[in-house]
Amino acid sequence: MAPRNLCNSLGNYKLTDLRKEVIREFYEEMRHAPRLDGRGNLSEKSVEGLHNTLCGILSAAVDEGYLTHNPAWRCYKPKGQKKERPVADEETVKKLITAFEGQSMKYETYFKLVLATGLRRGEACGLKWSDINWRKRTIHVQRGVVKLSHQESITKDPKTSSGDRMVYLSKEMCQLLKAWRKECEWDRAQTANETVDEDDYLFRQSNGKPMNPCTFTYRFKLILKANNLPLDLSVHSLRHTNASLLIAQGVDVRTVASLLGHAQASTTLDIYAHAFDKNKRKAQEKLGKAIGL
């Protein structure tokens, strides 16, 4: 059972592409996978067994020199012991936006874009100008920047069809992106006598390569400290905040899953169960007021 599940879900990955987030998502998918006898889903004990098997395989790969470390180490947390995901409330979101506006336009644009669309930090770094459809106000998410241990950042395509998706922009976000492009064009003209090409990354280094996601993580922590904002937040918290705000507005789970690029709606429901529970309570209260019960 374990080898088949491992091969079906992770068999297309190179060893060096097995990052912690990929492995954690695999465990979460297995929690929703049906048993062979049709009697419900896999038990937590089965998921733990998959983890132990994968750990053994990757430890052998380290011993043979194929990997420098075991990415599955400390990846497994039994269900029910998940750490609460930090999410900014509406008041904190307002403070974050104000703080972003005190940064250079590059950082303001990046952080507002992640908050507005729920992109992963690497997906935002992988965006090119050609991915934006200004008329339809959409962005085609079709690649991401990944930082591997002891290696330079690389750009990779999504591993699943759900990761390759469209996200939608408000008029205000479009205006900010256009302003950022104008600044990029001015900067390129001044420093290199060049123009911005459609194939250029939105957030690029001087050598033309996409910026490292870790650069934005470091800057985000500085912003939190400088503005007395909760230090448990991270760039990824902006993605969680986006999802939580969508749910609070009554957006259904399948739509949220599609926007976030989750392969299964059940993954979204599991991650944001608390937010959906709040919506259920609100719905029940509305019904109670309507019928007087």
Model regions: which residues?
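N-terminal core-binding DNA-recognition domain of tyrosine site-specific recombinases/integrases
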Residues: 1-66, 82, 103-105, 209-216, ...
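DNA breakage-rejoining catalytic core of tyrosine-based enzymes
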Residues: 16, 67-69, 79-98, 136, ...
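Conserved catalytic core of the tyrosine transesterase superfamily
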Residues: 25, 101-112, 138
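Short, basic (Lys/Arg/His-rich) helix/loop patches that form interaction surfaces
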Residues: 36-40, 98-107, 117, 167, ...
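Catalytic-site neighborhood detector that most strongly recognizes the C-terminal catalytic loop/helix
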Residues: 79, 83, 144-145, 260-286
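DNA/chromatin major-groove-contacting recognition/catalytic segments
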Residues: 91, 95-99, 150-155, 249, ...
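A short, basic/aromatic helix-end/turn motif that makes direct DNA contacts
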Residues: 126-132, 257-263, 273
